[in-house]
Regions:
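His/Asp/Glu-rich metal-coordinating catalytic cores
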Residues: 1-191, 209-223, 242-246
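Generic long, charged, amphipathic alpha-helical segments
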Residues: 251-272, 276
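A general structural motif
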Residues: 108-114, 179, 200-216, 239-243, ...
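Conserved bacterial/organellar gene-expression machines centered on ribosome-associated P-loop NTPases
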Residues: 357-450, 455-458
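A contiguous, basic/glycine-rich beta-loop/short-helix subdomain that forms a polymer-engagement track
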Residues: 159-234, 330-358
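Short, surface-exposed connector motifs at secondary-structure boundaries
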Residues: 123-130, 150-154, 226-231, 259-261, ...
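Proline-aspartate-enriched helix->loop->beta-strand connector
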Residues: 92, 127, 277-294, 449
Length: 464
């Protein structure tokens, strides 16, 4: 869709990448290849122009829903249930369906209800400045907020790079018609509180996002006032609850009024609840069912919903990343496993950097590195001099002479002990140095850097 293309073009432009092989599709597009054809069906989600994908192959038809919900009163276009049903009537071998809300019973809240509730808050807070945080990708929500602001004679100031980019793209694509409603931060600061709405990122409590900085009092352009109203038109993504609570607590300490989805229905998930998931299965009537996009418990629950809707239990597959299924002549069978997971890009190398290297880099960036250099004479099994110690990003050597001497002493003792061993080898010596220093450094400094022992064999000349 045009919205996605504009966002990709903007990302490429930021990185000075020229790429012209981007093509815009719509619901009527059919992509034909040598071995299979691809078509699309419109779905409803929190992002605009979302579509599911249908892949027609000689061995059967595969449907992938993408993220979706069924909203009978959406702000944007409705899902094309008629096309889904037609595809289902022709026969679907495999349905792969979004499992994000598979644990949630019932039907997801309509975006129109959110629309009404946000409108009521705006009406009840006519004299206050409104600061509203939501997902930048939720274009139809932002469209409604702008329309509500226009009804209430408010201008909208944008805060947060992703919010600014998304609104810019949405204006280009025609989702928003009224460009004059958007003003700059400087203009907002010169307007009365009841004449402006600050639309910002940070609904998930991200430390560097606009709302978090406003709550902390570190935002360069916005200072909270006691009569301000802050609206979280969102719900915490799993794992972000603590960050969101921290931001909300900071706002309460500033004395502002806060609205959250827990208090009012001012956010709707973009993912289908159980009854909507059942409807998707009923529309496509697949022979095989593969729930995806969710934790294992969500996938398992979704698979059980498939069985409830008529799919043979033996024809449901709860997979982990990397699991392979083979589709041959309409029959699906397990096909082993492939390597799957993060692919790290390191300069010009792709996929060559393992997680251990990334872990070391994170550790170095947080705690620094400590290098111990020792010269030994393996032939005579003696340590030549005191080990040298240097650090980067951990401590300053000149300001911690006592600590450095202790490190040297511990290292020296470990090396001498290893040299006396009958089965001495370099790797064991290095491991002993590391294991000996970790508890000491943790106790003395509260941090443990990467410890890198370097042991060199120096040959000494014997006197005749």
């Amino acid at each position: 869709p045009s919205n996605a293309k504009e966002l990709i073009d903007k990302k490429l432009e930021e990185r000075n990448i020229i790429y012209k092989n981007l093509f815009v599709y719509d619901e009527n597009t059919v992509i034909k290849t040598k071995y299979f054809n691809i078509e699309f069906f419109r779905t409803t989600h929190s992002i605009p122009d979302s579509h599911g994908v249908v892949i027609h192959t000689p061995d059967g038809t595969i449907v992938m829903t993408g993220d979706f919900k069924f909203d009978m009163t959406p702000i944007g276009p409705m899902s094309n249930l008629h096309k889904m049903a037609k595809i289902g009537e022709k026969g679907v071998s495999v349905l792969m369906s979004d499992s994000t809300n598979a644990l949630v019973p019932g039907v997801s809240l309509s975006e129109s209800v959110v629309d009404e509730n946000l409108g009521e808050i705006f009406s009840s807070c006519k004299d206050s400045r409104i600061i509203l945080a939501t997902f930048a990708s939720n274009v139809y929500r932002i469209k409604h907020i702008m329309e509500t602001c226009k009804k209430n004679k408010r201008k909208v100031a944008l805060f947060g790079r992703s919010m600014e980019n998304m609104v810019d793209v949405a204006l280009k694509c025609g989702y928003f018609k009224d460009k004059d409603i958007v003003i700059t931060a400087e203009e907002a600061n010169h307007m009365k509180p009841n004449e402006v709405c600050l639309l910002c990122t940070g609904s998930q409590g991200e430390p560097l996002a606009a709302l978090s900085r406003i709550a902390s009092g570190t935002h360069r352009q916005i200072t909270l006032m006691p009569d301000d109203v802050v609206i979280f038109s969102s719900s915490p993504i799993p794992g972000n609850g603590a960050s969101v609570s921290k931001t909300i607590n900071k706002l309460y300490k500033k004395g502002v009024k806060v609205f959250t989805n827990a208090m009012s229905e001012i956010h709707s998930s973009g993912h289908a609840n159980q009854e909507e998931l059942k409807l998707m299965i009923r529309l496509f009537k697949p022979r095989y069912f593969v729930p995806y996009h969710g934790e294992f418990r969500m996938l398992k629950t979704h698979a059980d919903l498939g069985v409830m809707c008529g799919v043979n239990k033996n024809n449901t597959f709860v997979l982990e990343n990397g699991d392979v299924l083979n589709l041959r002549k309409g029959v699906v069978t397990p096909g082993g496993k492939v390597q799957a997971g993060e692919v790290y890009v390191d300069g010009s190398r792709i996929g060559e950097v393992g997680s251990a290297v990334i872990k070391d880099r994170i550790l170095m960036s947080n705690n620094g590195i400590l290098v111990i250099i020792a010269n030994i004479d393996t032939e005579n099994k003696v340590l030549l001099g005191t080990p040298a110690v240097t650090t980067r990003g951990y401590i300053l050597v000149n300001e911690n002479e006592d600590l450095i001497r202790d490190i040297q002493s511990i290292s020296q003792g470990i090396i001498n002990k290893c040299l006396k061993s009958k089965y001495f080898n370099y790797n064991d010596m290095k491991s002993e140095i590391i294991n000996g220093l970790i508890p000491f450094l943790s106790d003395k400094t509260g941090r443990v850097p990467i410890i890198l022992p370097i042991v060199m064999d120096v040959k000494t000349k014997k006197e005749n």
